[in-house]
Every structure is written in C-alpha cells, then in structure tokens.
C-alpha cells in the first residue's frame, strides 16, 4: 500500500512532473526551521499547531509547518535576482485534530514579477492545473477574494488608520470581524482594567505600562518572554483604548456589512462592485481598475470566470497578504478542507528582511486531501 505521505506515491511523482513543466526551480528546504518567523508572522491557527523545540543554545526551532516563509527566507539569504519562480514538494508538520501530523504539500512561489495581474492569473491557473492533473473529473469550487478591495472600502468610508489596521487583521475571520464591528459601534462590553494600569493606558505611557506589566508577570511566575512581550501587550492595550474612543456612524457600518455580503461570479464582480460604489458615493476607482485587470488576465489564462466565486468577505487575517487570495475546494463536499490555496503577499519579503520590496504570489496544495478526492487506489 502506497500512502500519499510517501515520496514514492503516484500523486507525489505526478505533481513533480506538473511542477517541472512550469518554469520553476524545485528547491529543497530544511525540515528544521527557526521558529520566530512563523511565530511572528503566521496566523493564530498555525501558531497553535507548530511543533516547537530548542537547540543547545536555547534558540527556538520548529518542524517545517509550511513552505512560503522558508522559501522566501531562502531567496533573501541567497540574494537571488528576480523575477524568480520556486517550486516545492515535501513534508510539512502540524498538530491536527484529524489526520496525520505529517503530510505533503506542493506549490509554487512567484517572486518579483512586474506584471501583477498576469502573475496573479498564472498562480491561479497553475494551482488549478495541478489539481486537475490529479483529480481531472472532480467538481471544483474556486473562491476568490481581494485584500486590497477591502482596504479600499475602509479608506473610502473614512475610517481612521488604526481602525483600518484592526479590521484588516480580522479580514477573513468572520468571528473576529463581528467582534471588531461590534466594538466599532460601541455595543461590545469591555472588562475594565485595574486602576493602576488604566491610568497608564489613558496617558499613553507605553514604557511605564510595559514595566508594570513585566513586574506583574514576574510576580505571578510568568516569564515575560513567553508569548507576547510586555511591550507588545502595552502597545496593544493603548491601541485598544484609542480605538474604543472612536465610534462610527451606523449608516457607514451598514454599508460595510453590505459590502462584505457581496458574493457573485467573477464575470459579474467588477460590474457589481462599480455599481455598489456609485450607488453609495464611494471612491474605489484605483482598486477596481486593478481588480478588472486581474479578471481580464484570468480570462486570458483560459479560466472560465463564471466558474469562480468572488466573495467580498473572503481573505486571510495575516499582515503580509496584500491583494488576491483564493482557494480551490471540492464542490461535492466529499472532501473536507481546502485542496489548494494561494494569494499575493507583497509585504512578506520586506518583513523577513529583504532590503527592497519584492512582490510575491504563490499557492500550496494539500496532497492528502487531493488523494482522497481523486480516489487513488492504495
């Protein structure tokens, strides 16, 4: 019996052929990775699932939980020229309630391409081709979102910068978004802080607040280095106090909720968004031009736009995603979970230490889910 976790799996070999045909350098990434980049930049869900350890010097290490961050770090370390396309195929390790903790992923990271619309379309087309190569008869659902359109909507509504950042961090997480909107309307109750902390928060004294928090953590036997640092906690408390002082008109929040409820096929999405903006006197011109350029590029790549769902609320609550996000799923619901997911992350390489901005877009495929959908004989 050949399992998909094996590098001798037929699916593994078939995907290697697919990746080799796509003008991308197949790279080998070490299984053991420094943990800090994942802990600092990955979402809360992934942070909870990482297998952590330490080396003899006390440095935090982890088993590779995904490929995008280490592929980008490797590109920076090599000081490689762009544009550059990398492919990968190998094991990742995550604590999961269901399924094995070790499984295979494959994907492509496209770094430094000048034509954003074309590289976005190519990423989606490559992901779709790889999935169809393994499961040619499977009914697929493609869902597409756009972080930049949501950001443009927040700007057009006149939201303060602090609230824009908070809502962007919640984009794609329905529960977190509901809590943020309730907070913005002033309907969410907040637990009061102890008076000694509340005074420092009200004064915006980040240094004094961090010192007090560190002292309280040490007194309680909690290491200040475990989890968020006292400085990070202090900064977040002061930010929350500033945000709580801002309340937004109910009509504007209703418009935001109407926007998030938009879910249409991609071939009608641009018209729908332009009509929504015109009807409500919102300036979304620049972001919608980019949205339309990408839709045109997707059509030119041979993908039927009527088969793609644009969901205005679909995103990823990660700081480095900047535009396109997408997922390919099993439309028959026989297989739970995402088969392939991708998106544009133009901030990631700078956050990882690149000396200049390097745009990026990429995707990952879950081989175990794809095998289950394809019904490969074992």
From Swiss-Prot:
- Provide an example Pfam family for this protein: tRNA-synt_His
Cellular compartments annotated:
Cytoplasm
* Gene Ontology CC entries for this record: cytoplasm
Q: Name one GO molecular function term.
A: histidine-tRNA ligase activity
Q: What else is known?
A: This function is generally fulfilled by the C-terminal part of HisG, which is missing in some bacteria such as this one.
Role played: Required for the first step of histidine biosynthesis. May allow the feedback regulation of ATP phosphoribosyltransferase activity by histidine.
Protein name (database record): ATP phosphoribosyltransferase regulatory subunit
């Amino acid at each position: 019996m050949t399992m998909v976790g094996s590098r001798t799996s037929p699916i593994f070999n078939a995907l290697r052929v697919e990746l080799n045909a796509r003008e991308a350098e197949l790279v080998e990434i070490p299984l053991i990775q420094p943990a800090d980049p994942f802990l600092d930049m990955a979402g809360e869900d992934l942070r909870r699932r990482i297998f952590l350890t330490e080396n003899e010097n006390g440095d935090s290490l982890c088993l590779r939980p995904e490929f995008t961050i280490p592929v980008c770090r490797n590109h920076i370390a090599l000081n490689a020229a762009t544009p550059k396309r990398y492919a990968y195929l190998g094991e990742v390790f995550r604590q999961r309630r269901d399924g094995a903790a070790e499984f295979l992923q494959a994907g492509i990271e496209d770094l430094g391409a000048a034509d954003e619309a074309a590289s976005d379309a190519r990423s989606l087309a490559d992901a779709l081709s790889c999935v169809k190569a393994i499961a040619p008869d499977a009914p697929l659902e493609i869902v597409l979102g756009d972080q930049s359109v949501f950001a443009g909507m927040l700007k057009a509504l006149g939201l303060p910068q602090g609230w824009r950042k908070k809502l962007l961090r919640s984009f794609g997480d329905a529960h977190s978004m509901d809590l943020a909107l309730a907070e913005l309307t002033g309907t969410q109750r907040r637990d009061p802080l102890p008076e000694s902390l509340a005074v420092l928060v009200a004064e915006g004294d980040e240094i004094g607040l961090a010192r007090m928090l560190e002292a309280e953590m040490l007194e309680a036997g909690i290491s200040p280095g475990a989890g968020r640092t006292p400085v990070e906690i202090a900064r977040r408390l002061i930010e929350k106090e500033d945000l709580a002082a801002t309340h937004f008109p109910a009509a504007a929040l209703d418009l935001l909720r109407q926007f998030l409820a938009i879910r249409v096929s991609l071939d009608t999405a641009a018209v729908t968004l332009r009509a929504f903006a015109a009807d409500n006197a919102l300036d979304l011109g620049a972001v919608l031009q980019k949205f339309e350029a990408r839709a045109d590029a997707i059509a030119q790549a041979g993908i039927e736009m009527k088969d793609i769902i644009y969901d205005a609320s679909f995103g990823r609550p990660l700081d480095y995603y900047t535009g396109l996000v997408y997922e390919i799923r099993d439309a028959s619901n026989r297989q739970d979970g995402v088969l392939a997911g991708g998106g544009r992350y133009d901030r990631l390489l700078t956050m990882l230490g690149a000396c200049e901005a390097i745009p990026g877009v990429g995707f990952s495929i879950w081989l175990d889910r794809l095998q289950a959908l394809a019904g490969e004989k074992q």
